[in-house]
Amino acid sequence: MASSRCPAPRGCRCLPGASLAWLGTVLLFLADWVLLRTALPRIFSLLVPTALPLLRVWAVGLSRWAVLWLGACGVLRATVGSKSENAGAQGWLAALEPLAAALGLALPGLALFRELISWGAPGSADSTRLLHWGSHPSAFVVSYAAALPAAALWHKLGSLWVPGGQGGSGNPVRRLLGCLGSETRRLSLFLVLVVLSSLGEMAIPFFTGRLTDWILQDGSADTFTRNLTLMSILTIASAVLEFVGDGIYNNTMGHVHSHLQGEVFGAVLRQETEFFQQNQTGNITSRVTEDTSTLSDSLSENLSLFLWYLVRGLCLLGIMLWGSVSLTMVTLVTLPLLFLLPKKVGKWYQLLEVQVRESLAKSSQVAIEALSAMPTVRSFANEEGEAQKFREKLQEIKTLNQKEAVAYAVNSWTTSISGMLLKVGILYIGGQLVTSGAVSSGNLVTFVLYQMQFTQAVEVLLSIYPRVQKAVGSSEKIFEYLDRTPRCPPSGLLTPLHLEGLVQFQDVSFAYPNRPDVLVLQGLTFTLHPGEVTALVGPNGSGKSTVAALLQNLYQPTGGQLLLDGKPLPQYEHRYLHRQVAAVGQEPQVFGRSLQENIAYGLTQKPTMEEITAAAVKCGAHSFISGLPQGYDTEVGEAGSQLSGGQRQAVALARALIRKPCVLILDDATSALDANSQLQVEQLLYESPERYSRSVLLITQHLSLVEQADHILFLEGGAIREGGTHQQLMEKKGCYWAMVQAPADAPE
């Protein structure tokens, strides 16, 4: 099939994606410089009345945002293809859209902020003058210098909101917020406390500046006392609010952890049987416990810190803008230098550290090889050669250590010098503002303290970001389980008041999901009649236990159908079906609970002690239970570790009989019972009046039980080879006769 894409004209050279991206971005910025910077203020000066300067500024800013956003979308579309691929844009290209927003909203936001802080003094904000300044080349440069780090941070945080790629988990952060559920009110209260506490923390820098002015102006003692008292009150209030907020947050996260872990465990329990065979129990347990705990710990610690410092940073930024726009711009412009340069040098230092460790390992390997092979070294008279080789490795380590020392010094120097340059720049520009009377000395001191706190907040946010990403990664694994749809059919609705227990296998075939090409059962057709015991015998691996698993609806046939009283098994309601069909295996699972709880396991209505005792008596379990010090309240240990194999089988038989099922499956369920208990089970199957109210599928090695069965089926290779009563099959002298005649210890 021919490609639908038209070939490029001969002689036309298509630009590669990277070149096209750079060209489109440069043209977009040129358009912003040549057209938008000068044209938009003139246009809206004509359209918007002079009496509404703030509206004019916002109209210009929003228009600039819209034009730049359309241009950014055009560059993305031309570079990465269709709109559906824009989400996969890599690197700086993906930051074009947030950059357009930052450039468009910076000036209107500043104008609105100045209007708000000058409320009650009309005209003092002077939005018109701000608009004219915004079209000046210096303002253009400052706007880009401030918008670039903001757009980079926006894009970086936006990567947390990228939809998960698997499991249909959707947006992971939104899913995490959705897990908060009913805790929204508490979290809202927590955020309010964070804001109030952050504002209270800013009392110390604010009043420090006030006290500085008081000292320089030789103010009264009352002013000093009043400022110091207010600072103390606000600081104490901030600490109290932080304590209360942390308590509310940790309590909320505890509730979220319990709720989320319960939801994940419930989702796992709803999965089909094949899921538990294809996934190791340890991996599933790790998802349910460790991943949810990791997520909860990260939410409790990292998200809390992230919110604290994010709110604190925003409050500090607002107060810094209120104090001095020019000093704030200097801070924002120099922040990338403050963090990026030490980060790059730090990577070089870390790389050298790795190389030093590798060289140490190689030198150790040389020494170990020489010392462990001394007879060989001596027989070849190569002692000096090995020593020289070791000295060469030491010389490599020495060279790397020297480089590492230089890198460490440069790393420390860049960290300190970048912070020092920022402080010097702030003090230099601030000193000029103080000299000109634009700000007071106290305001400059306040700003410097705020700037130090703001820098610390940004540094903490950048350090916490990878840990928040890790939490998002953990949440995606958890949501894979929450969103996974079980591959078993949904629970049916049939719950008839009475079941006969007629079971029909109609041409049933089956292959396990992990081996779909290997049929375990092939065209199986037989019937279990109410009031009869049908014994299923055959060699190991013939499919007997698979028949029992299908009858429990643990798997679905790959061919044919399985009917209970004429209705397909999946049409019955899940709980109802497993009350009517009970099974006991050779190694039944007993839970680490009391014997009473194990016998009543899974019943929606708690049985009486008389019913529990009666079920235990029927299978011979009551005799050993009554001899225990705590009787039916005895804890059996993890997985029934305090019980013998026969006792576990007896408890499992009682657990099945208390349900009064219409279909009873015994899959080698008496192999570990003692003689008395086996006799009781034999009487239960063939002499009890209750036998006529249920169908029994018996899989066993005990021929004494098989001989009395109403019908015997010999299964081999997944197919029924012969069937009949014991007498009929012995007369045929076929497969069953050969099995009976074989020595007791011979393999089947």
Swiss-Prot record:
Its ancestry begins with: Eukaryota, Metazoa, Chordata, Craniata, Vertebrata
Q: What cofactors does the UniProt entry give for this protein?
A: Mg(2+)
Provide the residue positions that the database annotates as binding Mg(2+). 545
Which residues are involved in binding ATP?
538-546, 641-647, 701
Lumenal compartment segments: 37-53, 114-133, 208-227, 320-328, 440-443
Q: Where does this protein reside within or beyond the cell?
A: Endoplasmic reticulum membrane
Q: Which Gene3D superfamilies match?
A: ABC transporter type 1, transmembrane domain, P-loop containing nucleotide triphosphate hydrolases
Q: Which Pfam families match?
A: ABC_membrane, ABC_tran
Region named Part of the peptide-binding site: 375-420, 453-487
Q: Domain ABC transporter: where?
A: 503-742
Molecular functions per Gene Ontology: ABC-type peptide antigen transporter activity; ATP binding; ATP hydrolysis activity; metal ion binding; TAP1 binding
Q: Any idea of its EC number?
A: 7.4.2.14
Protein name, as recorded? Antigen peptide transporter 1
Q: Which reaction does it catalyse?
A: a peptide antigen(in) + ATP + H2O = a peptide antigen(out) + ADP + phosphate + H(+)
Mark the transmembrane ranges: 16-36, 54-76, 93-113, 134-154, 187-207, 228-248, 299-319, 329-349, 419-439, 444-464
